[in-house]
Amino acid sequence: MSNCINDDTVYMMDFKGLENILIDMDGVLLDTEYDNYFWQKHIPLKYAELKSIDTDQAIKITHTLFNFKKGNKDWYDLDYWSNMLGLDVEKEKLSDDMINRIKLKKGAIKFLDKYHNDKNLYLVTNAHRKTLNIKMQKFPLMNYFKMLICSHELRHVKEEIPFWFILRNKLGIDYNKSILIEDTIDNVKSAYHAGLRSILIGDSLNYKDMPCFNDLSSFSSSLK
């Protein structure tokens, strides 16, 4: 059972003095079904066709490669995987079947509408720029944000502590007046070491030592 705070829980967060909201994309604004299906099912099927092998063998090969790179910048790099697998990964992501799987999470637009005028919103994602562009074609959220940051371009991923120091310098913001909204605990932990507070979003999370909400809708309803 999740310990995330829900709409029925009395929880108020004071936004007084808060200037900057750093927001993750996948798992916070967008549902992760698109990415999960793409890497776990779609790419193995295409790899099986390319190599003329059975699907189970293709799944074993591709998932082994993915797991080996998980947590570093290659894992998010479409060009890396195109070269590694011999597939045009960007083209596969642009197929109609895949584009139709990109979906907004509950409360995403309402949250952005509510805060983009009086707070500095920054999209901070591990997604490759090509992946970000594909998703922004489906849901053009760019104008809500002061800047769209892809970790790959800072040569570190969000799981790595140096990323957050480099990001702070790039944005020129005070982390004491900022908050991160994330769905990945490893990213929250690394951000903490740079002095950045976080809110966890996710219906399966189970952390008692920090604010945790099922989605942006329940988080927004808790704010003063």
Set out the residue ranges of the language-model regions.
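Hydrophobic residues in well-ordered beta-strands that form the structural core
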Residues: 31, 123-125, 200
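N-terminal helical cap/lid subdomain that shapes the substrate entry/recognition surface
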Residues: 4, 8-110
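Asp-based, Mg2+/Mn2+-dependent phosphohydrolase catalytic module
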Residues: 2-21, 113, 128-129, 133-224
